[in-house]
Amino acid sequence: MNLGTLVSETRNPQTMDLDALPTPELVKRFNEQDTLVAEAVKATLPDVARAVDAAAAALKSGGRIIYMGAGTSGRLGVLDASECPPTFGVPHGLVVGLIAGGPGALLKAVEGAEDCQQAGEDDLVALNLQEQDLVVGLAASGRTPYVIGGLRYARQSGCTTVAVSCNPDSPIAREANIAISPVVGPEALTGSTRLKSGTAQKMVLNMISTGAMVKFGKVYQNLMVDMKATNVKLVDRACRMVVEATGIGREEAEALLKQTDFEVKPAILMALTGLDAAAAREKLAAHQGFLRAALEH
């Protein structure tokens, strides 16, 4: 492949004079380019929706969401995965981020790590990949061998696969069941795909993980009701969620949360139904953790 022909590697005619610009104009040019990202992502929403449903299906069948990428793409996957346990109360390891070169590559580039297809397969083998898992390959260029190797192995293993790339008709797209390709155009700094391409990938990952968790019963209305209240800020947020979802006063919300070890879902159910903590937990379990279903039935 001639990498110079990739959209993400071409020069941007709107930013040819970056080194000659005064600072206010410099940042204006970057901002102008960033405004293009949301529209590029918008064009992919039908494919993102398919990925959300696939991710939710994986979780409901006992599988995992596994992101894999190199460099910025890999770091974005690790970032999204690491935010899921505190935000949605899921165990570590339910959403996994793999980066070419291993954890050390998060802080320091591991040269050449992305160029090995076998490494992508090996990292999935080490995770004991199961067919219920969803594998999401991330590569701005769309041709990273590490990601191609991982996606190919995942499909051979019976997994549903998703490819996220910022170039059209990319090699990783051809390896996946679902291809998401927000084409953001040439970067302001030629080839620096940590810029618009990274932003687009982050937006897509936000929707995949958050959408899947909504479908997995981790959200009520627009509240993160399975959040772990592990610090002062989050305890306060838990109280506010109970107040906002039920209309009760803060003192009553705090009293209910103390009975549930600051678990928000049973506290809301208690406030709205009069159940005690044990009965609220039992009813939630009977509805697979979906608070709305527990309230309506």
Swiss-Prot record:
Induction: Induced by MurNAc 6-phosphate that releases the repressor MurR from the DNA. Repressed by MurR in the absence of MurNAc 6-phosphate. The keyword Lyase applies. InterPro entries: Etherase_MurQ, Glucokinase_regulatory_CS, MURQ/GCKR, SIS_dom, SIS_dom_sf. GO terms for biological process: 1,6-anhydro-N-acetyl-beta-muramic acid catabolic process; amino sugar catabolic process; N-acetylmuramic acid catabolic process; peptidoglycan turnover. Residues 55-218 form the SIS domain. It is an enzyme of class 4 (lyase). It comes from the Bacteria. A lyase-type mechanism (elimination/hydration) is suggested for the cleavage of the lactyl ether bond of MurNAc 6-phosphate, with the formation of an alpha,beta-unsaturated aldehyde intermediate with (E)-stereochemistry, followed by the syn addition of water to give product. Homodimer. Belongs to the GCKR-like family. MurNAc-6-P etherase subfamily. This is N-acetylmuramic acid 6-phosphate etherase.
